[in-house]
Amino acid sequence: GGGELVPTDGQWRQVAAGADLAEGAVHSFDLGSVAGFVRRTQGRVEAVSGVCTHQGCKLWFDQSVDQLRCPCHLTSFSPAGQVVTHALPNAPKPLPHFDVRERDGVIEVLAPPPSEPA
């Protein structure tokens, strides 16, 4: 697998209206069990995890530099999930992608089922 998160019994959840997501725009979502960002690039919609792969800190989108930033260790990712800058001994992993679709003007992400309490 290419690092894709493929939930076995997830469900499609609405994260944005297609009309709200302009070309190149980034929209954050939080469904409880999963949080991330959707982006439209060249007409296609992509969704990446909004949680840093290093220690699970919540990322925020910095529009001025078009990057997802981690407040914990100054790591930043491209909206496609690739590491742009980091100050760690080893680069963190790229952000996982979610299955995403646009249907009837609605953008939906395949959210994993709520996790069992550990």
Enumerate the predicted regions with their spans:
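Extracellular/periplasmic metallocenter environments
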Residues: 71, 79-80, 101
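Iron-sulfur (Fe-S) cluster-binding segments and ferredoxin-like electron-carrier domains
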Residues: 59-64, 76-82
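Short cysteine/histidine-rich metal-coordination sites, predominantly Zn2+-binding motifs
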Residues: 66-74, 84-95
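N-terminal pre-ligand scaffold of iron-sulfur
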Residues: 1-65, 94-118
